[in-house]
Amino acid sequence: MADAYAHREQREYVFTGTRGRVFVREWPGDRARSIVLLVHGYGEHTGRYEELAAVLAAHGAAVLGPDHIGHGRSGGERVVIEDFEDVVTDLHTVADRARAGHPGLPLVLVGHSMGGLIAARYAQRYGDGLAALVLSGPVIGAWETPARLLSHEEIPDIPISPAALSRDPAVGAAYAADPLVWHGPMKRPTLEAFVRALAAVDEGGDVGRLPVLWLHGDDDRLVPLPGSRVGVERLSGVDLTERVWPGARHELFHETVRAEVFAELTRFLDRVSGC
């Protein structure tokens, strides 16, 4: 599928965010009917979502997403996030620019893993400006990794296993070879920020009538499904769509079943954007 979208146009821009330079990628849509704002996960960057972005752009979405501070081509010490509220504020800056370029179009947030945490908090702060929220393997609810790592005097260097991402070996190989991906240990300020952000989302209330699509693999060992369910059920309001793929691992947008995942997502976009 990736080859079919290999030449999709991409644009870039930068702005000064709350804590430094933020790099943003854009994929213009074909006669855009909606705006999709991608929110990437820990240690990675939006460049890993080119296939997803191209599929969505071909389906009529104007797609864009920032590299969070400390990630990818944005500034800051690598993988250091002092406060996730700042990342949410930066994301809102990107959303405002997208709305200005596409006035009147519905805006949908798609957050993966740590990006799901950021997207959830965004929906709590700025949900009135959203048409829908999509969460893929979201770090919300009962996620024990930060507390476990913080219990050590020195944070252990336990790299993410590429095999935990997808059953497609090419995905793991590309991840391991990507110079913009962080392959070192998690950092204490970021882990502490995770703890605060998880609590903020937990205490921030539900999103009311905002449509929510939750996507998860039942063999996700990085962000186990049961813990996420706690957070999703607390966050979602009256309109939750849940889709779980048997045997799938953490990165559904890079999984062997990604064509099914893309189809589920585009159907949801059609519904929430009134197409």
Q: What are these model-derived regions, one by one?
A:
Residues 43-45, 72-102:
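Catalytic nucleophile-loop/oxyanion-hole region of alpha/beta-hydrolase
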Residues 53-76:
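Conserved alpha/beta-hydrolase
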Residues 208, 214-216, 220:
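Short beta-strand/loop motif that positions the catalytic acidic residue
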Residues 134-143:
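Active-site nucleophile loop of the alpha/beta-hydrolase fold
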Residues 239-275:
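Catalytic active-site module of serine/aspartate enzymes centered on a nucleophile-bearing elbow/loop
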Residues 33, 41-44, 218:
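Active-site glycine-rich loops that stabilize anionic/oxyanionic intermediates
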Residues 224-233:
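Short alpha-helix in the alpha/beta-hydrolase fold that links the catalytic acid
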Residues 1-28:
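N-terminal cap/lid segment of alpha/beta-hydrolase-fold proteins
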